Swiss-Prot record:
Keywords: Amino-acid biosynthesis, Aromatic amino acid biosynthesis, Decarboxylase, Lyase, Tryptophan biosynthesis. CDD domains: IGPS (cd00331). This is Indole-3-glycerol phosphate synthase. It holds the Pfam family IGPS. It comes from the Bacteria. PANTHER family: INDOLE-3-GLYCEROL-PHOSPHATE SYNTHASE, TRYPTOPHAN BIOSYNTHESIS PROTEIN. GO terms for biological process: L-tryptophan biosynthetic process. GO terms for molecular function: indole-3-glycerol-phosphate synthase activity; phosphoribosylanthranilate isomerase activity. Pathway: Amino-acid biosynthesis; L-tryptophan biosynthesis; L-tryptophan from chorismate: step 4/5. The keyword Ribosomal protein does not apply. It comes from Lactiplantibacillus plantarum (strain ATCC BAA-793 / NCIMB 8826 / WCFS1) (Lactobacillus plantarum). It catalyses: 1-(2-carboxyphenylamino)-1-deoxy-D-ribulose 5-phosphate + H(+) = (1S,2R)-1-C-(indol-3-yl)glycerol 3-phosphate + CO2 + H2O. The keyword Lipid metabolism does not apply. InterPro entries: Aldolase_TIM, Indole-3-glycerol_P_synth, Indole-3-glycerol_P_synth_dom, Indole-3-GlycerolPSynthase_CS, RibuloseP-bd_barrel.
Length: 260
């Protein structure tokens, strides 16, 4: 299973860092007073917000961008009016780096999200140190105790937690753990298949007090309009934008008829 491999690789990377260094990283993040752009304030804006992803590769699609000027991509997104940027930092399967997140965060004027397979508190701390506004937490790879602890830590570090779910049961688990932002992933992480209908099917299971983000498989303005009509606060779009030669045009096409 692809997900098991991703989690195992993430755990191995964490374990390569000495425990003392991991503790020091968390302590450093706790002491930081540098303000970050608010991810939740972005989601609170009227209309359907667009989160553009910076992603070089994926397990299902292989190499997406042979030429990968990640800073230019981020700047193109911002110039096109993107509302936030998601940065893949997973190195083995997505060819990402934490340094990409840090450089992009220092360059752009919109909130950034660390997208990775987070399995340890030190990874959340590293996101804060890199300047991110939010971290992705995946319900499917965390125990209820871990999920609650990681959401709490993120909030203590002034980070938002985008808590990703794929089923109604996971959505309930996320809410019980204290999630304020729910990301509904149309992609099944067990086999990486995509079903766009998942978003709208699960939307009604998310309480009104939570922000809700649709993830994966979003390619057209019609889909964006469906998400807006269903009451989503944002959509996270990766491959569609990454493959577009004119990212500004791609952003405009996705937003056609959608206020955001």
């Amino acid at each position: 299973m692809i997900l098991d491999q991703l989690v195992q690789a993430s755990q191995q990377r964490v374990q390569k860092v000495p425990v003392r260094e991991r503790v020091k990283r968390i302590q450093q993040a706790r002491k930081m007073t540098t303000p970050v752009l608010s991810f939740e304030a972005m989601l609170a804006q009227p209309g359907l917000q667009l989160i553009g992803e910076v992603k070089r590769a994926s397990p299902s699609k292989g190499l997406i961008a042979a030429e990968f000027d990640y800073l230019q991509i981020a700047q193109d997104y911002v110039a096109a009016g993107i509302d936030a940027i998601s940065v893949l930092t997973e190195p083995r399967y997505f060819k990402g780096q934490l340094s990409y997140l840090q450089a992009i965060t220092q360059t752009v004027s919109v909130p950034t999200l660390r997208k990775d397979f987070i399995v340890a508190a030190s990874q959340i701390a590293s996101a804060r140190i890199a300047g991110a506004s939010a971290v992705l937490l995946i319900v499917a790879i965390l125990t209820p105790v871990q999920l609650q602890a990681f959401i709490t830590l993120a909030h203590e570090l002034n980070l938002s937690a985008l808590v990703e779910v794929h089923t109604t049961a996971e959505s309930k688990q996320a809410v019980a753990a204290g999630a304020r932002i729910i990301g509904i992933n149309n992609r099944n992480l067990k086999d990486f298949s995509v079903n766009f209908a998942t978003s709208c099917q699960l939307r009604q299971a998310v309480p009104a007090e939570c922000y809700v983000v649709a993830e994966s498989g979003i390619q057209t303005a019609t889909q964006a309009q469906q998400l807006a009509a269903a009451g989503f606060d944002a959509m996270l779009v990766g491959e569609t934008l990454m493959r577009a030669p004119d990212k500004g045009q791609a952003v405009m096409q996705l937003r056609a008829g959608v206020r955001g």
